[in-house]
Amino acid sequence: MTASSSLFSCSMHMEVLTPKISKWPKDFVSCHSKISYVETNYLKSTCYPISRFLCINNLSKCDKMIKTRQRDGIHCFSEGQKFQLDDVIEAQQFDRDILNAIFEIARDMENIERNSPESQILKGYLMATLFYEPSTRTRLSFESAMRRLGGEVLTTENAREFSSAAKGETLEDTIRTVEGYSDLIVLRHFESGAARRAAAIAGIPIVNAGDGPGQHPSQALLDVYTIEREIGKLDGIKVGLVGDLANGRTVRSLAYLLAKYKDVKIYFVSPEVVKMKDDIKDYLTSKGVDWEESSDLVEVASECDVVYQTRIQKERFGERLDLYEKARGKFIVNQNILNAMQRHAVIMHPLPRLDEITVDVDADPRAAYFRQAKYGLYIRMALLKLLLVGW
């Protein structure tokens, strides 16, 4: 006998492991839901018979609105049902049903942020942000998201230098220690695969906030959400990924998510030394996604609904600064690119920006990158709510 959800499935004879469960306040009750699934390839196959807990007290007006939208069938997941993921590690974890449901909750979070500053959805929960690489938007948006939902934050600035990692402590030991202080860890690390290692030993949710040149799944979620809000659709779009495609984790995760949608075409525009890696191109081909490499940004911009610009990542070049200088400045979004773009199209950027988008572009309504950063708050509010209290 096999039970399944829209995202995962597992046979009942498979090994049953203890689910990750955080510390729960006494005024929480259990809502049972038979959900079984297999996680992605970085963790063992797991079956969970019990949902996460759902708070029943101190719901604000907007909190109650979320429950009403769920009862009205805005998305296909039941109120109180456990979120299908224990951790957010890579973009491949999400299917279209999950993405659509997350986006609906993100819209609810917009209402909470605007109309319900006293939300208590995550009251009693602690989130730890553990960042081994610099961050402004990702760290602050996660911390803002947690506090706007009534939760608390433990944070460390530059954990690579100012934590016990500087004394030689392993990532695994740090995770085991920090999980004793918190209910969820948001981790950024300089090594690809670090979030996967953390999730394998942690008993609480791990959110990958960027692992070296690997992935940045929450950024990809907010990017796709931004496209939906700005363009109005996700099927049938054309997206130009521009800049450092070899080292940029955001473009890798975004490519994985775009492959979930129909009739998407992706253009890769980059200097020769930072071209998109073959694993992404092979993945897109395997999913039937049309992609093309080009060196003509003007032509690509004229075709695309989205021009997604990225900076050349100097920190990934090590001592080969000659290669960095060779790549820098080759593809710049300026007035010439704006003139070539369609009127409905938008320019996106994960930020920070250096000189790859000229400042005069900011005044054009098609410059969506600061709106994109704001959408990230709502996506991260939605993720924290789902990981800690479920649908």
From Swiss-Prot:
Keywords: Allosteric enzyme, Chloroplast, Plastid, Pyrimidine biosynthesis, Transferase, Transit peptide. Carbamoyl phosphate binds at R137, T138, R188, H216, Q219, L351, P352. Homotrimer. It comes from Pisum sativum. This is Aspartate carbamoyltransferase 3, chloroplastic. It holds the Pfam family OTCace. Gene3D superfamilies: Aspartate/ornithine carbamoyltransferase. Catalyzes the condensation of carbamoyl phosphate and aspartate to form carbamoyl aspartate and inorganic phosphate, the committed step in the de novo pyrimidine nucleotide biosynthesis pathway. Feedback inhibited by UMP. GO terms for molecular function: amino acid binding; aspartate carbamoyltransferase activity. Belongs to the aspartate/ornithine carbamoyltransferase superfamily. ATCase family. Its EC number is 2.1.3.2.
